[in-house]
Swiss-Prot record:
Pfam families, alphabetized: DUF576
Residues lipid-modified (N-palmitoyl cysteine): 23
Topology in membrane: Lipid-anchor
Gene Ontology terms: cellular component: plasma membrane
Compartments where located: Cell membrane
Signal peptide from the UniProt entry: 1-22
Gene source species: Staphylococcus aureus (strain USA300)
Family stated for the protein in its record: Belongs to the staphylococcal tandem lipoprotein family.
Keywords: Cell membrane, Lipoprotein, Membrane, Palmitate, Signal
Protein name: Uncharacterized lipoprotein SAUSA300_2428/SAUSA300_2429
Lipid linkage positions (S-diacylglycerol cysteine): 23
InterPro entries for the chain: Csa, Csa_sf
């Protein structure tokens, strides 16, 4: 009887230890997930910045990577990628380097087409059109004979100018992951077509699917903040071997480099 009681007590003790350990792990995971979501929320707080000139006076996260005299450079990038079934993949997007030291902005409108040859090898053809930004206007810096393309470049709007994540804290059922070895972290949320940002993308781009996208937020670097690393977001409408439709965007604050172009 005594042996039986000791055995029962031992089993209960082991179960209690497992239960406590599980609670500790769950608490740590929930705390880290909340930290990841808050980290992304800070990044998304710059959306929307309708006037790109406002970035000249907008301060970002600074660490030891920055020279004390360097005010930093904002790098903004937006790209739409469409690969219909049986057709080539094409991406059209723009990147700008907004230098807060010189208060000048330059970048490129980039068109990339990926084809597949008879042997199944992928071939990438990229064309860059240099631009500058003045008074919130995109201006090509070299002649563009194609009027339609010129108009597309001049009328280009970055997602940061119209995207809005004021309700991000209310996003539910996210799939949040963390890899401490890189370190990297991500969050995924299934959206619907009534979502404001989805409606804005459909308004500006011909998106050949009615399927609602998944929002993917990806980051790397120290969760507490670092200028080394990156954060970007992606609206994935379709992703498979035959068809790909997605929109990607990033806004980063980095130490300035004079040779950016």
């Amino acid at each position: 009887m005594i042996h039986s009681k000791k055995l029962t007590l031992g089993i209960c003790l082991v179960l209690l230890i497992i239960l406590i350990g599980g609670c500790v792990i769950m608490t740590k995971t929930n705390g880290r997930n909340a930290q990841i979501k808050e980290n992304f929320n800070k990044t998304l707080s710059v959306y929307p910045t309708k006037n790109l000139d406002d970035f000249y006076d907008k301060e970002g996260f600074r660490d030891q990577e920055f020279d004390k005299r360097d005010k930093g450079t904002w790098i903004i990038y937006s790209e739409m990628v469409i690969e219909p079934k049986g057709k080539n993949m094409e991406s059209r997007g723009m990147v700008l380097y907004i230098n807060r030291n010189t208060r000048t902005t330059k970048g490129n409108f980039i068109v990339t087409e990926i084809t597949e040859d008879s042997k199944g090898y992928s071939r990438s053809k990229e064309k860059k059109y240099p631009v500058k930004m003045e008074n919130n206007r995109i201006i090509p810096t070299k002649p563009i004979p194609d009027d339609k393309l010129k108009k597309e470049i001049e009328n280009f709007k970055f997602f940061v100018q119209y995207g809005n994540f004021k309700d991000f804290k209310d996003y539910k059922n996210g799939d949040i992951s963390y890899n401490p070895n890189v370190p990297s972290y991500s969050a995924k949320y299934q959206l619907n077509n009534d979502d404001y940002n989805v409606q804005q993308l459909r308004k500006r781009y011909h998106i050949p699917t009615k399927q609602a996208p998944e929002l993917k937020l990806k980051g790397s670097g120290n969760l507490k903040g670092s200028s080394v690393g990156s954060k970007d977001l992606e609206f994935t409408f379709v992703e498979n071997q035959e068809e790909n439709i997605y929109f990607s965007d990033s806004v980063e604050f980095t130490p300035s480099e004079d040779d950016k172009s």
